[in-house]
Amino acid sequence: MDNYTYSELLKSLQNKCDNIALIIKPEKIKQELERIEKEQEDPNFWQDVLKARDTNKEKVRLNRLLETYQKTKNSLDESTELFELAQNDNDEVTLSLLYEEAPVLEHSVQKVEIEIMLSGENDASNAIITIQPGAGGTESQDWASILYRMYLRWAERRGFKSEILDYQDGEEAGIKGVAFIIKGENAYGYLKNENGVHRLVRISPFDANAKRHTSFASVQISPELDDDIDIEIDEKDVRYDYYRASGAGGQHVNKTESAVRITHFPTGIVVQCQNDRSQHKNKASALKMLKSKLYELELEKQQSTAKNEEKSEIGWGHQIRSYVLAPYQQVKDARSNTAYSNVEAILDGDIDAILEGVLIAKA
């Protein structure tokens, strides 16, 4: 890096910071925080538990956003001032240090951008993830299990918790389907753009001739809804099926019909849960999944109407990302149009750069 390149980087980052300030309005955030603090001083504030909880969550979010912005702005201003002084004094040591810290400065501005993008209505929610293999039998079922592990490892890396709702083993390898919840701050906000088809190209470990195979799996993400969000489901619109939960190889792991499958006729959505030995708990979890999917579907319809466009089909034609393991190694996302070479790390859950790249591309 040289003086000109660093100078242009500072201008670009300052411009981004100015735009961020126009969006978040730091002074208004301070005023809102003062208002919330006064509201919390009222002895009657905590009588409405749900409202108090939501207000406190908003206070935490605003505080974090303001602190992140101010810290980044201060660092950027200090770097700009130091750069000007170092240039005037021909201080090569300081200039070299500034060049080394440039990626950190750039990342801090990007972090504020991400914070803004994770301020949607449901972004702070837990994420319900459903993975289904495409056509292709064992190949696609194995690919679905690889994706499942990738998201679990991502959750582990972030210190998030996960809970299985439904898990169906594949006949030879992999899985026929899985539904699970990732619980953590902004889990849905980060993962919401994972909706779509994920494509894998590799030398098949199941092919004796070691031929290259292409496999597909569908990922669907919906927010876990708070209990205070009311979604009406007409009983005549659904069918409940009860069956025995199955383990590996089709073995019955429960003698009672504790597993629950719900079919919603108007939308064609099917959800199922067999995680618990209690049919009642499985039914409650399946209903929660259905409500989350219906809520997500309605939001997508509203957004499509607002943009005056048709809702994009989340199906086998909606391919969002390719993972190529042979003849070369590369992961490419169709939304950010960015390619990544650290395929092994990505499949081990190192997907933050991809998730953030898509968030920025869709901003």
Swiss-Prot record:
Alphabetic keyword roster: Cytoplasm, Methylation, Protein biosynthesis
* PTM annotation: Methylated by PrmC. Methylation increases the termination efficiency of RF2.
**Name of this protein:** Peptide chain release factor 2
Please state the protein's primary subcellular location. cytoplasm
- Where N5-methylglutamine occurs along the chain? Q251
What role does it play?
Answer: Peptide chain release factor 2 directs the termination of translation in response to the peptide chain termination codons UGA and UAA.
Q: Does Protein biosynthesis appear among the keywords?
A: yes
Q: Fetch the InterPro entries from UniProt.
A: PCRF, Pep_chain_release_fac_I, Pep_chain_release_fac_I_sf, PrfB
Q: Which Pfam families match?
A: PCRF, RF-1
Instruction: Give the GO cellular component terms, alphabetically.
Output: cytoplasm
